[in-house]
Amino acid sequence: MAYSTDHDVVLDFPILIGDIGGTNARFAIVVDSYAEPREFPVVQTADFATIEDAIQTAILDQTHLIPRSAVLAVAGPVNGDEIDLTNSNWVVRPREMMAHLGFSDIVVLNDFEAQALAVVALGEEHLEKIGGNVAETVGSRVVLGPGTGLGVAGLVHARRTWIPVPGEGGHMDLGPRTARDEQIFPHLERIEGRVSGEQVLCGRGLVNLYRAIAKADAKEAAFSSPAEITTAGLAQADEIAVETLNLFVTYLGRVAGDLGLVFMSRGGVFLTGGIAQKIVPALKNSLFRAAFEDKAPHNELMASMPVYVITHPLAALHGLAAYARTPARFGVETAGRRWRLR
Protein backbone atom coordinates (compact mmCIF):
# COMPACT_ATOMS: atom_id res chain seq x y z
CA MET A 1 0.00 0.00 0.00
CA ALA A 2 1.32 3.48 -0.86
CA TYR A 3 2.46 5.93 1.77
CA SER A 4 -0.46 8.05 2.91
CA THR A 5 -0.92 10.83 5.42
CA ASP A 6 -3.87 12.93 6.52
CA HIS A 7 -2.77 16.23 4.97
CA ASP A 8 -5.87 16.33 2.74
CA VAL A 9 -8.32 14.22 4.73
CA VAL A 10 -10.12 15.25 7.91
CA LEU A 11 -11.93 13.08 10.42
CA ASP A 12 -15.65 13.53 11.00
CA PHE A 13 -16.69 14.75 14.45
CA PRO A 14 -17.50 13.67 17.10
CA ILE A 15 -14.27 11.66 17.40
CA LEU A 16 -13.60 9.03 20.04
CA ILE A 17 -9.96 9.06 21.09
CA GLY A 18 -8.44 6.26 23.13
CA ASP A 19 -5.08 5.46 24.70
CA ILE A 20 -5.03 1.67 25.11
CA GLY A 21 -2.25 0.43 27.35
CA GLY A 22 -1.44 -2.99 28.68
CA THR A 23 -3.18 -2.30 32.00
CA ASN A 24 -5.39 0.77 31.54
CA ALA A 25 -7.42 2.30 28.73
CA ARG A 26 -8.28 6.00 28.69
CA PHE A 27 -10.97 7.46 26.46
CA ALA A 28 -12.38 10.86 25.55
CA ILE A 29 -14.64 12.33 22.89
CA VAL A 30 -13.67 15.40 20.84
CA VAL A 31 -16.87 17.13 19.75
CA ASP A 32 -15.36 19.66 17.34
CA SER A 33 -12.11 21.42 16.45
CA TYR A 34 -12.36 23.86 19.35
CA ALA A 35 -13.84 21.84 22.21
CA GLU A 36 -11.77 20.30 24.97
CA PRO A 37 -12.02 16.50 25.01
CA ARG A 38 -14.76 15.08 27.20
CA GLU A 39 -12.94 12.52 29.33
CA PHE A 40 -14.29 9.31 30.83
CA PRO A 41 -13.15 7.24 33.83
CA VAL A 42 -10.09 5.06 33.30
CA VAL A 43 -10.94 1.53 32.15
CA GLN A 44 -9.05 -1.49 33.50
CA THR A 45 -8.39 -3.71 30.48
CA ALA A 46 -8.69 -6.85 32.61
CA ASP A 47 -12.32 -5.93 33.44
CA PHE A 48 -13.54 -6.44 29.87
CA ALA A 49 -13.11 -9.38 27.51
CA THR A 50 -12.80 -7.17 24.42
CA ILE A 51 -12.18 -3.56 23.52
CA GLU A 52 -15.64 -3.42 21.93
CA ASP A 53 -17.22 -4.38 25.27
CA ALA A 54 -15.19 -1.72 27.05
CA ILE A 55 -16.09 1.06 24.61
CA GLN A 56 -19.78 0.15 24.57
CA THR A 57 -20.17 -0.22 28.34
CA ALA A 58 -17.77 2.39 29.70
CA ILE A 59 -18.15 5.06 27.01
CA LEU A 60 -21.08 4.84 24.60
CA ASP A 61 -23.60 3.77 27.23
CA GLN A 62 -22.56 6.74 29.39
CA THR A 63 -23.10 9.57 26.90
CA HIS A 64 -25.60 10.93 24.42
CA LEU A 65 -22.78 11.67 21.98
CA ILE A 66 -22.44 9.31 19.03
CA PRO A 67 -18.86 9.27 17.72
CA ARG A 68 -18.53 8.99 13.95
CA SER A 69 -14.76 8.46 13.95
CA ALA A 70 -12.17 6.97 16.28
CA VAL A 71 -8.45 7.52 16.77
CA LEU A 72 -6.90 4.85 18.97
CA ALA A 73 -3.37 4.47 20.25
CA VAL A 74 -2.43 0.91 21.20
CA ALA A 75 0.49 -0.69 23.01
CA GLY A 76 2.23 -2.59 20.25
CA PRO A 77 2.93 -2.50 16.51
CA VAL A 78 0.02 -1.82 14.16
CA ASN A 79 -0.03 -4.46 11.44
CA GLY A 80 -3.03 -5.83 9.55
CA ASP A 81 -6.69 -6.06 10.46
CA GLU A 82 -6.06 -7.80 13.79
CA ILE A 83 -3.83 -5.85 16.16
CA ASP A 84 -2.56 -7.66 19.23
CA LEU A 85 -1.82 -5.51 22.24
CA THR A 86 1.45 -5.96 24.11
CA ASN A 87 0.85 -7.06 27.73
CA SER A 88 -2.94 -7.40 27.21
CA ASN A 89 -5.38 -10.01 25.89
CA TRP A 90 -7.32 -7.47 23.87
CA VAL A 91 -7.20 -7.63 20.08
CA VAL A 92 -8.16 -4.54 18.07
CA ARG A 93 -10.20 -5.45 14.98
CA PRO A 94 -11.18 -2.15 13.34
CA ARG A 95 -13.62 -3.67 10.86
CA GLU A 96 -15.51 -5.41 13.66
CA MET A 97 -15.51 -2.20 15.68
CA MET A 98 -17.05 -0.37 12.73
CA ALA A 99 -19.73 -3.02 12.38
CA HIS A 100 -20.58 -3.26 16.09
CA LEU A 101 -20.03 0.29 17.34
CA GLY A 102 -21.10 2.40 14.36
CA PHE A 103 -17.82 4.11 13.46
CA SER A 104 -17.31 5.08 9.83
CA ASP A 105 -13.61 5.94 10.15
CA ILE A 106 -10.92 4.47 12.45
CA VAL A 107 -7.23 5.33 12.72
CA VAL A 108 -4.98 3.15 14.89
CA LEU A 109 -1.57 4.41 16.02
CA ASN A 110 1.15 3.11 18.30
CA ASP A 111 0.68 4.32 21.87
CA PHE A 112 4.00 6.14 21.91
CA GLU A 113 3.19 7.87 18.65
CA ALA A 114 0.43 9.50 20.67
CA GLN A 115 2.94 10.43 23.36
CA ALA A 116 5.15 11.95 20.66
CA LEU A 117 2.22 13.96 19.28
CA ALA A 118 1.61 15.26 22.80
CA VAL A 119 5.11 16.70 23.05
CA VAL A 120 4.26 19.59 20.72
CA ALA A 121 0.75 20.03 22.11
CA LEU A 122 1.63 20.38 25.81
CA GLY A 123 2.48 23.67 27.48
CA GLU A 124 5.42 24.31 29.80
CA GLU A 125 3.12 23.90 32.80
CA HIS A 126 3.02 20.17 32.03
CA LEU A 127 6.79 19.71 31.73
CA GLU A 128 9.34 19.29 34.55
CA LYS A 129 12.83 20.08 33.28
CA ILE A 130 15.76 17.83 34.25
CA GLY A 131 18.81 19.81 33.13
CA GLY A 132 20.18 20.86 29.75
CA ASN A 133 19.84 24.03 27.72
CA VAL A 134 16.81 25.60 26.07
CA ALA A 135 15.15 23.26 23.58
CA GLU A 136 15.31 24.13 19.89
CA THR A 137 11.83 25.05 18.65
CA VAL A 138 11.81 22.61 15.73
CA GLY A 139 14.56 20.31 16.98
CA SER A 140 14.03 16.56 16.83
CA ARG A 141 12.62 14.97 19.97
CA VAL A 142 12.31 11.54 21.51
CA VAL A 143 9.84 10.24 24.07
CA LEU A 144 10.36 7.23 26.30
CA GLY A 145 8.30 5.95 29.16
CA PRO A 146 8.70 3.15 31.66
CA GLY A 147 5.27 1.72 32.40
CA THR A 148 3.84 -1.74 31.76
CA GLY A 149 6.71 -1.94 29.27
CA LEU A 150 9.22 0.60 27.93
CA GLY A 151 7.74 2.66 25.13
CA VAL A 152 9.81 4.75 22.72
CA ALA A 153 8.99 7.07 19.81
CA GLY A 154 10.73 9.87 17.97
CA LEU A 155 9.36 13.13 16.60
CA VAL A 156 11.06 14.96 13.74
CA HIS A 157 10.16 18.21 11.98
CA ALA A 158 10.27 18.37 8.19
CA ARG A 159 8.39 20.40 5.57
CA ARG A 160 6.63 22.35 8.34
CA THR A 161 5.16 19.15 9.69
CA TRP A 162 5.76 17.12 12.84
CA ILE A 163 6.35 13.47 11.94
CA PRO A 164 6.10 10.83 14.69
CA VAL A 165 8.47 7.88 14.35
CA PRO A 166 7.14 4.80 16.17
CA GLY A 167 9.31 1.84 17.01
CA GLU A 168 10.19 -0.80 19.57
CA GLY A 169 13.22 0.93 21.07
CA GLY A 170 12.41 -0.43 24.50
CA HIS A 171 13.74 -3.80 23.37
CA MET A 172 17.28 -2.58 22.69
CA ASP A 173 20.00 -4.42 24.59
CA LEU A 174 20.94 -3.14 28.04
CA GLY A 175 24.34 -4.26 29.28
CA PRO A 176 26.55 -3.83 32.35
CA ARG A 177 29.16 -1.06 32.46
CA THR A 178 30.44 -0.97 36.05
CA ALA A 179 31.79 -3.54 38.48
CA ARG A 180 28.53 -3.30 40.43
CA ASP A 181 26.56 -3.94 37.24
CA GLU A 182 28.66 -7.06 36.69
CA GLN A 183 27.56 -8.35 40.10
CA ILE A 184 23.88 -7.64 39.51
CA PHE A 185 23.24 -8.47 35.84
CA PRO A 186 23.74 -12.26 36.20
CA HIS A 187 20.71 -12.27 38.52
CA LEU A 188 18.35 -10.38 36.21
CA GLU A 189 15.56 -12.36 34.58
CA ARG A 190 16.15 -12.60 30.84
CA ILE A 191 14.14 -13.18 27.69
CA GLU A 192 15.76 -15.86 25.53
CA GLY A 193 19.13 -15.14 27.07
CA ARG A 194 19.20 -11.37 26.73
CA VAL A 195 18.51 -8.33 28.88
CA SER A 196 16.70 -5.53 27.07
CA GLY A 197 15.80 -2.10 28.35
CA GLU A 198 12.27 -3.31 28.99
CA GLN A 199 13.54 -6.07 31.29
CA VAL A 200 14.67 -3.38 33.73
CA LEU A 201 13.07 -0.04 32.84
CA CYS A 202 9.39 -0.66 33.51
CA GLY A 203 7.22 -1.64 36.46
CA ARG A 204 8.04 -5.34 36.44
CA GLY A 205 11.62 -4.41 35.50
CA LEU A 206 11.93 -2.40 38.69
CA VAL A 207 10.97 -5.53 40.64
CA ASN A 208 13.39 -7.57 38.51
CA LEU A 209 16.21 -5.17 39.39
CA TYR A 210 15.28 -5.11 43.08
CA ARG A 211 15.34 -8.90 43.31
CA ALA A 212 18.62 -9.09 41.39
CA ILE A 213 20.29 -6.72 43.84
CA ALA A 214 18.98 -8.75 46.77
CA LYS A 215 20.32 -11.97 45.23
CA ALA A 216 23.69 -10.39 44.45
CA ASP A 217 24.02 -9.37 48.11
CA ALA A 218 22.47 -12.58 49.50
CA LYS A 219 19.72 -10.57 51.21
CA GLU A 220 15.98 -11.03 51.49
CA ALA A 221 13.77 -9.07 49.10
CA ALA A 222 11.15 -7.47 51.33
CA PHE A 223 9.03 -5.89 48.60
CA SER A 224 7.22 -7.35 45.62
CA SER A 225 5.60 -4.39 43.83
CA PRO A 226 6.96 -1.36 41.97
CA ALA A 227 4.97 0.99 44.20
CA GLU A 228 6.48 -0.45 47.38
CA ILE A 229 10.00 -0.24 45.98
CA THR A 230 9.73 3.34 44.70
CA THR A 231 8.06 4.52 47.91
CA ALA A 232 10.75 2.93 50.09
CA GLY A 233 13.51 4.15 47.81
CA LEU A 234 12.31 7.75 47.77
CA ALA A 235 11.89 7.67 51.56
CA GLN A 236 15.37 6.16 52.04
CA ALA A 237 13.59 3.49 54.09
CA ASP A 238 15.15 0.34 52.63
CA GLU A 239 18.78 -0.10 51.55
CA ILE A 240 18.01 -2.37 48.61
CA ALA A 241 15.15 -0.14 47.44
CA VAL A 242 17.42 2.92 47.56
CA GLU A 243 20.04 1.22 45.40
CA THR A 244 17.33 -0.10 43.08
CA LEU A 245 15.99 3.39 42.49
CA ASN A 246 19.49 4.81 42.03
CA LEU A 247 20.37 2.16 39.46
CA PHE A 248 16.98 2.50 37.78
CA VAL A 249 17.52 6.21 37.11
CA THR A 250 21.12 5.51 36.07
CA TYR A 251 20.07 2.88 33.52
CA LEU A 252 17.22 5.11 32.37
CA GLY A 253 19.75 7.90 31.86
CA ARG A 254 21.96 5.63 29.76
CA VAL A 255 19.09 4.53 27.53
CA ALA A 256 17.63 8.04 27.27
CA GLY A 257 21.06 9.34 26.29
CA ASP A 258 21.46 6.68 23.62
CA LEU A 259 18.08 7.59 22.15
CA GLY A 260 18.93 11.28 22.34
CA LEU A 261 21.99 10.57 20.20
CA VAL A 262 19.99 8.46 17.73
CA PHE A 263 17.50 11.27 17.10
CA MET A 264 19.92 14.17 17.80
CA SER A 265 17.21 15.42 20.12
CA ARG A 266 18.04 19.11 20.36
CA GLY A 267 14.32 19.64 20.89
CA GLY A 268 14.46 17.54 24.03
CA VAL A 269 14.24 14.06 25.47
CA PHE A 270 10.89 13.48 27.18
CA LEU A 271 10.12 10.99 29.93
CA THR A 272 6.47 10.08 30.30
CA GLY A 273 4.19 7.84 32.34
CA GLY A 274 3.31 7.31 35.97
CA ILE A 275 6.68 5.89 37.02
CA ALA A 276 8.63 8.87 35.67
CA GLN A 277 6.20 11.27 37.31
CA LYS A 278 6.52 9.54 40.68
CA ILE A 279 10.32 9.40 40.73
CA VAL A 280 11.03 13.01 39.72
CA PRO A 281 13.01 13.59 42.95
CA ALA A 282 15.28 10.66 42.06
CA LEU A 283 15.61 11.85 38.47
CA LYS A 284 16.75 15.23 39.75
CA ASN A 285 19.71 13.80 41.61
CA SER A 286 23.02 13.75 39.77
CA LEU A 287 22.90 10.06 38.78
CA PHE A 288 20.39 10.35 35.94
CA ARG A 289 22.00 13.37 34.32
CA ALA A 290 25.52 11.94 34.75
CA ALA A 291 24.53 8.73 32.98
CA PHE A 292 22.65 10.66 30.30
CA GLU A 293 25.65 12.86 29.51
CA ASP A 294 28.32 10.12 29.72
CA LYS A 295 28.48 9.57 25.96
CA ALA A 296 32.08 10.30 24.96
CA PRO A 297 33.05 11.78 22.58
CA HIS A 298 29.74 13.68 22.71
CA ASN A 299 29.59 14.66 26.39
CA GLU A 300 29.35 18.36 25.59
CA LEU A 301 26.46 17.78 23.19
CA MET A 302 24.64 15.67 25.77
CA ALA A 303 25.17 18.25 28.52
CA SER A 304 23.29 20.77 26.36
CA MET A 305 20.41 18.42 25.52
CA PRO A 306 17.34 19.14 27.67
CA VAL A 307 15.34 16.41 29.38
CA TYR A 308 11.75 16.84 30.53
CA VAL A 309 9.32 14.77 32.55
CA ILE A 310 5.81 15.05 31.13
CA THR A 311 3.55 15.70 34.12
CA HIS A 312 0.21 15.82 32.29
CA PRO A 313 -1.79 12.80 33.55
CA LEU A 314 -3.39 12.17 30.14
CA ALA A 315 -0.62 13.19 27.77
CA ALA A 316 -1.38 10.59 25.09
CA LEU A 317 -5.03 11.65 24.92
CA HIS A 318 -3.85 15.25 24.61
CA GLY A 319 -1.71 14.23 21.64
CA LEU A 320 -4.52 12.27 20.02
CA ALA A 321 -6.87 15.22 20.46
CA ALA A 322 -4.36 17.53 18.75
CA TYR A 323 -4.11 15.11 15.83
CA ALA A 324 -7.89 14.60 15.62
CA ARG A 325 -8.50 18.35 15.43
CA THR A 326 -5.81 19.19 12.85
CA PRO A 327 -4.36 16.12 11.10
CA ALA A 328 -2.50 18.34 8.62
CA ARG A 329 -0.21 19.54 11.41
CA PHE A 330 1.24 16.05 11.69
CA GLY A 331 2.79 13.73 9.13
CA VAL A 332 1.12 10.60 10.45
CA GLU A 333 1.40 7.66 8.10
CA THR A 334 -2.05 6.11 7.72
CA ALA A 335 -1.38 3.51 5.03
CA GLY A 336 -2.52 0.20 6.48
CA ARG A 337 -3.63 1.95 9.67
CA ARG A 338 -6.87 3.63 8.62
CA TRP A 339 -10.16 1.89 7.99
CA ARG A 340 -13.10 3.71 6.36
CA LEU A 341 -16.56 2.83 5.15
CA ARG A 342 -16.76 3.41 1.43
UniProtKB/Swiss-Prot annotation:
GO terms for biological process: glycolytic process. It catalyses: D-glucose + ATP = D-glucose 6-phosphate + ADP + H(+). Transmembrane segments: none annotated. It is found in: Cytoplasm. One of its GO terms (cellular component) is cytosol. InterPro entries: ATPase_NBD, Bacterial_glucokinase, Glucokinase. Its EC number is 2.7.1.2. ATP binds at G18, D19, I20, G21, G22, T23. One of its GO terms (molecular function) is glucokinase activity. Disulfide bonds: none annotated. Keywords: ATP-binding, Cytoplasm, Glycolysis, Kinase, Nucleotide-binding, Transferase. It comes from the Bacteria. Belongs to the bacterial glucokinase family. This is Glucokinase.
